[in-house]
Amino acid sequence: MAKTDIARRVYNHAWKLDPIIRSLIDTDFYKLLMLQMIWKLYPDVNASFTLINRTKRVHLAEEIDEGDLREQLDHARTLRLSKKEMIWLAGNSFYGRAQIFEPEFLAWLSNFQLPEYELSKKDGQYVLDFHGSWKETTMWEIPALAIVNELRSRSAMKALGPFTLDVLYARAKAKMWSKVERLKELPGLRISDFGTRRRHSFLWQRWCVEALKEGIGPAFTGTSNVLLAMDSDLEAVGTNAHELPMVAAALAQTDEQLRNAPYKILRDWNKLYGGNLLIVLPDAFGTAAFLRDAPEWVADWTGFRPDSAPPIEGGEKIIDWWKKMGRDPRQKLLIFSDGLDVDAIIDTYRHFEGRVRMSFGWGTNLTNDFAGCAPTEISGLNPISIVCKVSDANGRPAVKLSDNPQKATGEPAEVERYLKFFGAEDRVDQTVLV
C-alpha cells in the first residue's frame, strides 16, 4: 500500500471536498453481518438511530461547521458498492466460511444507498437522526460517527502550519509505536483494530493498522474495518452489537417476550452464522440478568464479549458462570473491547493468561490518541465519547442498560422500567472517557 504523508495531506486544503467516507464498506464488519440478518429476518421493521454525545462539556455544534457536516453526510449518501467490493464480499472467506453473504442479499446490497438524515442544533449540540427501515438506517451508525469525529479533528488542526502538523504526527507515530513495543512482550497475544467509529481520521486509522501489521505480525489478527481489511489483505473481524437485542426488546409485546429478547436474537444469529461467529454480547440489559436467565445452550457458544464492565471483573463473572454450567473456561474465548489502553490490555492479559482464551479489540485508544502530541494543548484533539444508538423500533422506544449506568441510553421512564424488570445487579458506575 502506498504511504501517505498525513501531515501534508491535512495541510493541503486545495480540493473542494476531501471525503471522510470513501466507501460504503468503510464500516465495521459486524454491520454487514447484522445487516444480512435484518434484511432476511426483520425486513419490515422500522428503526431510528440517534447521535449521542456523552461528553456533554464538548459542544459539537460550536466546534464543527454545519455546512461541512451536511456536505460530508450528503457525500456519503452518493456512495454505492463498487464492482471490486462486490466481488470481494462474494468471493472471500470470513471466519473460515465461504459465501457467508447470500447471493440475494448481495444483489440487494449492490443498489444500497444510505437513507436521508435529519440535522438540527440544540444547546450547542447537533441533533442527528436517521428514520426509516431498519435495514437502511442501521448502516448510518459507523459513517455518521466517523464523519463527526474526523470533522472535529480537522477543525482542531485547521490553524496549524505544516511544521506544527509534522511534529504532531511524528509524535503520534512515536507514541503509537511505543505501544506496539509493549505489546510485543505478550506471547500468544491476539489483538485486532476496532477503531473505526471514533478514529482521528481514515488515513490515521490506516497508518495504525499498517503499523500493527508490521510491528506485531501474527498477533495482529485483523481489523473490523471492511475497507481496510480488503485493501490490506487482513481478516475482517466482528460479530454482533447491542442494536439487535435492543430492537427485539422494543418490539416485545409481553414480559415473556421482553425477557427472552436477547436469547431470541442469539437463536436467530445461530441459524444464519453459527461456527466461529458464536460470540455472546451479554450486557445490553445487564450481564447479571443475562446470565441469570440464560438457557443452558448459551454456555455452548464459543465465547463472550464483556463490553461495559471492568475487563477483569467482567471476565471473572463469565468464567464463574461457565464453571457453574459445567464448561471448561480454558476452552472458551473472552473478547475484551471496552475503552482499552495498553495498560488495560497488558493487565487483563496477564490476569487471565492460561485460564481462558483471549482476544482484544482495540478501539479509540488505538486510532485517536493524540494526547500530548501537539506542541501546545489542543482540546479538540482529545477523543470524546460519542455513540449512535437505536432510539425506537416501530415507534416503540429502545433502551440499553449496560453494566455501566453512564452508558445507558433511552427515555428515562423506559430506562427505569427496564431496570425494574431486569434488575440493577452488579452495575458499576464508571466515568466514560471514550
UniProtKB/Swiss-Prot annotation:
Keyword terms of this UniProt record: Ligase, Phosphoprotein, Pyridine nucleotide biosynthesis
Xref: InterPro entries: N/Namide_PRibTrfase, NAPRTase_N, Nic_PRibTrfase, Nic_PRibTrfase-Fam, Nicotinate_pribotase-like_C
E.C. code: 6.3.4.21
GO cellular component, one term: cytosol
GO BP terms, alphabetized: NAD biosynthetic process via the salvage pathway
Signal peptide residue numbers: none
List of residues that carry Phosphohistidine: H242
GO molecular function: nicotinate phosphoribosyltransferase activity
Entry comment on modification after translation: Transiently phosphorylated on a His residue during the reaction cycle. Phosphorylation strongly increases the affinity for substrates and increases the rate of nicotinate D-ribonucleotide production. Dephosphorylation regenerates the low-affinity form of the enzyme, leading to product release.
Enzyme class name: ligase
Keyword hit for Mitochondrion: no
Pathway(s) of this molecule: Cofactor biosynthesis; NAD(+) biosynthesis; nicotinate D-ribonucleotide from nicotinate: step 1/1
Catalytic activity: nicotinate + 5-phospho-alpha-D-ribose 1-diphosphate + ATP + H2O = nicotinate beta-D-ribonucleotide + ADP + phosphate + diphosphate
Annotated family: Belongs to the NAPRTase family.
HAMAP family recorded: NAPRTase
Protein function: Catalyzes the synthesis of beta-nicotinate D-ribonucleotide from nicotinate and 5-phospho-D-ribose 1-phosphate at the expense of ATP.
PANTHER family, alphabetized: NICOTINATE PHOSPHORIBOSYLTRANSFERASE
Protein name (database record): Nicotinate phosphoribosyltransferase
Organism: Rhizobium etli (strain ATCC 51251 / DSM 11541 / JCM 21823 / NBRC 15573 / CFN 42)
Gene: pncB
